[in-house]
């Protein structure tokens, strides 16, 4: 029994240390990507993390669903270049605030016409809405191929890797990890080196900060 208890204690300690290390790395990724700004042609879409809780509301009203904006900068012919993700409520004010931070005035934003996306013009960007009508057919529209492919890959990766993390509390960090990796996918050699350098130069992150609901600057 002693051996069993001792092994359990070691396992709990190791899990806690692994969690802290993981979130320190996620925080570094978040800080590295926090100043990311997109320009040129940009596809945007509304997206959600999480699913229905047992006995909870279905669909977008689920208590476990977290909304976030997905934006993918592309070439003029639609090939993806960079991505920008942020947890937010789909209101015009929230999108306007995000646009001022994440879009250059030269951005040409393509959206599905959701009312809140009119807020992208707050950055000086131009907006070209295309009302899709929703449903399965809407994801096949060529104007949104890059962002739809990106979101499909993101959701598949999350479903296969993360099964029980707190979407509401830690979505910013996990989305930052996806963004960090995607934006460096064309030169994988810089991912580890850049992460080590950024981590070494960042200030210490005590556990209470890492467990806080919002990322710390």
List the model feature ranges, each with a label.
Residues 1-217:
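Residue-level recognition of single "structural anchor" positions
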